[in-house]
């Protein structure tokens, strides 16, 4: 099973386990809600899919790496309590609440979400003293004498023994009480995630050329060499930040993330060439519609990997513009929705308060503060992905700027105050239109270059396919259109259908002994 399918299964399970009947009881009793056990190699993305699943299901998430805990923190600390049994006073040992269970209640209190996912990582790598506690947790859904609260779905994760020397096998009794999912690395599925997360284009194009280098764990005389999906993503974040700071990444730095000598050397060499192609071909000039004649001449002698790298660079430049347009859209939409609520609030202002100086700015400021508080609450609950969080933060920043403008205007009545805000929104709308026009112009310029340089070659197929697979590009084109994209995509689909029909025909002929 790949990680995408596992995520879907987790989401479906959460919805099924939290579904309620007509009486408000959980449709599947807690005793029949089997914990999910994810088994897969390290760095494959198990923790990240838990965050995504919780966010998409609208529930809280408490995540623990159990190898960081002792028996005392998992079970609780012992203390002596006096009891009377059969008329005789005795001292008995009880336990404080487990730190993990306490964290669940703390999360409920902080977020207001009463249902969620309790995720325990590396569950089969615990120490000998903690192993019985983990078995009890999976079998009985308790830590010590404290049960996991109702409405919390248990998901655990572990590594197969070939990846971790500390692994302890579960017995059949335990395995018969869980839902086990075995997860394997899958580059095409990971690339779907990488596109949506805007991972560095050099990494995506490199793995397109060298898919075998996506995930490897090799043991030799010098120790274990490895490269994982987590390593590529963390390296991507660093490369993007280095570029924004004008810093250069070298092989020594890459080895800190890609801990496989041969692959690190290979990617470092590719990254140097990638930057060289960006400068030699003038990617920004191409997207501005000013491609140099020398670029076309250089492509005539270029090998396929160089041509593919150039296509990746063009797509990266477009992706940046699509993302900027999407952010501008999201902020404008957020401000528009806020202004609709503001208009209602202005209309409902009591007459006696409407006479106070700057009352409109004060009301607007209070509403903005409420918006910021709501954003923080959703952020704490993990209900906002990165684009949604960025949009809300930028919206709040914009609203604070409007508040200052409203204060300076000292509007005497609601109509005047709202007119000031409407003018501010007009400026914001112009900025959104500018971002959209810039992205559309760059897309047209990219098609101009692709047609002149590659016509209908394999490079054009890659270009159109990547536009189709990119969430940002797909959303932008669906909203704003691009005639040439639709035409090339239509031709590509027709070619695929013809190829599929030919394959079916050949298979049918083979079955009947005609070939």
Task: State each model region's role.
Residues 1-212, 217-220:
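AAA+ P-loop NTPase catalytic core and its hallmark functional loops
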Residues 196-352:
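Alpha-helical lid/collar subdomain of P-loop NTPases
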Residues 300-515:
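Terminal-proximal interaction/regulatory segments of ATP-powered molecular machines
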């Amino acid at each position: 099973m790949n990680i995408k399918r596992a995520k879907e299964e987790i989401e479906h399970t959460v919805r099924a386990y939290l579904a309620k009947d007509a009486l408000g009881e959980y449709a599947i009793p807690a005793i029949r809600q089997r914990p999910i056990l994810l088994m897969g190699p390290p760095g494959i993305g198990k923790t990240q899919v838990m965050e995504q699943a919780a966010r998409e299901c609208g529930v809280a998430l408490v995540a623990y790496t159990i190898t960081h805990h002792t028996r005392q923190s998992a079970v609780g600390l012992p203390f002596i309590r006096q009891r009377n049994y059969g008329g005789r006073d005795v001292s008995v040992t009880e336990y404080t609440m487990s730190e993990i269970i306490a964290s669940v209640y703390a999360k409920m209190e902080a977020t207001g979400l009463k249902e969620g996912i309790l995720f325990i990582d590396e569950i089969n790598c615990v120490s000998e003293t903690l192993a019985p506690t983990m078995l009890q947790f999976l079998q009985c859904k308790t830590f010590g004498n404290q049960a996991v609260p109702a409405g919390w779905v248990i998901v655990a994760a572990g590594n197969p023994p070939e990846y971790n020397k500390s692994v302890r096998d579960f017995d059949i009794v335990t395995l018969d009480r869980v839902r086990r999912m075995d997860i394997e690395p899958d580059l095409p599925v990971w690339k779907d995630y990488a596109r949506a997360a805007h991972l560095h284009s050099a990494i995506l194009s490199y793995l397109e050329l060298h898919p075998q280098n996506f995930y490897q764990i090799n043991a030799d005389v010098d120790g274990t060499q490895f490269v994982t999906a987590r390593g590529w993503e963390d390296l991507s974040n660093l490369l993007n930040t280095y570029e924004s700071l004008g810093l250069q990444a070298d092989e020594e730095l890459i080895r800190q993330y890609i801990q496989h000598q041969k692959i690190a050397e290979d990617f470092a060499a590719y990254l140097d060439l990638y930057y060289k192609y960006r400068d030699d071909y003038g990617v920004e000039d191409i997207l501005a519609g000013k491609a140099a004649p020398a670029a076309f001449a250089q492509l005539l002698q270029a090998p396929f990997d160089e041509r593919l790298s150039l296509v990746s660079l063009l797509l990266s430049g477009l992706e940046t513009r699509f993302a900027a347009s999407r952010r501008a859209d999201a902020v404008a939409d957020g401000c528009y929705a806020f202004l609709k609520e503001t208009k209602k609030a202005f209309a409902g202002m009591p007459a006696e308060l409407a006479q106070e100086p700057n009352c409109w700015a004060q009301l607007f400021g209070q509403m903005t503060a409420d918006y910021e508080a709501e954003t923080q609450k959703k952020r704490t609950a993990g209900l906002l992905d990165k684009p949604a969080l960025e949009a809300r933060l930028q919206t709040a920043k914009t609203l604070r700027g409007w508040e200052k403008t409203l204060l300076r205007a000292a509007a005497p009545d609601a109509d005047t105050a709202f007119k000031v805000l409407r003018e501010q929104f007009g400026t914001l709308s112009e900025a959104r239109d500018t971002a959209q026009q810039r992205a559309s112009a760059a897309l047209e310029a990219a098609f101009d270059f692709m047609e002149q340089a590659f016509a209908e070659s394999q490079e054009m197929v890659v270009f159109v396919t990547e536009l189709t697979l990119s969430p940002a590009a797909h959303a932008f084109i669906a909203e704003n259109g691009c005639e040439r994209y639709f035409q090339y995509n239509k031709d590509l689909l027709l070619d695929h259908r013809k190829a599929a029909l030919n394959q079916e025909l050949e298979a049918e002929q083979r079955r009947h002994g005609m070939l």
